[in-house]
A protein has these predicted regions:
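Phosphate- and other anionic-substrate recognition elements at nucleic-acid/protein interfaces
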Residues: 1-143
């Protein structure tokens, strides 16, 4: 499948900024979306070309990755500690971050990180919750 568009996502709790670029770096579209399943699905469904997307791994990027992944030719998460181009820039805002992520994925320079399958992430979530409950029970017994 020939990928024609490269999309950079700057993910936040309540919004997602995006920038769509062609293979030569021309900006086709950019904007901000509300971070909800319905809005993201509708937006991704309207993308006409096969696209390759990337976002920085954050606390909120897991469910966004799961929502967008079926629509993308390829979707990756960038390792936050290794994405120095964004962190080191002097001029920072969400729009510019999305542009830089689109350029990084377009040039195939994304330091990708492992994204565990949904089942594994759900097991991890349950184990974290269990550890919390066990810790609270232990604190109560020790009072």
């Amino acid at each position: 499948m020939n990928v024609n568009h490269y999309i950079g996502f700057d993910v936040h709790k309540k919004s997602v900024n995006y920038c769509v670029k062609t293979a030569d770096g021309t900006i086709i579209d950019e904007g901000r979306l509300r971070a909800t399943h319905d809005v993201l699905r509708r937006w991704a469904g309207e993308r006409p070309e096969p696209w390759h997307g990337a976002m920085e791994a954050t606390l909120f990027s897991g469910w966004i990755y799961d929502t967008l992944q079926p629509f993308a030719a390829e979707l990756q998460m960038g390792h936050p500690a290794l994405m120095k181009a964004i962190a080191a820039s002097k001029k920072k805002n969400d729009k510019l971050d999305a542009r830089k992520i689109a350029d990084i994925v377009r040039c195939n320079l994304l330091p990708a990180c492992y994204v565990a399958p949904v089942e594994i992430r759900e097991l991890r979530r349950m184990l974290r919750y269990r550890n919390l409950v066990v810790g609270q029970a232990t604190r109560m017994k020790n009072k």
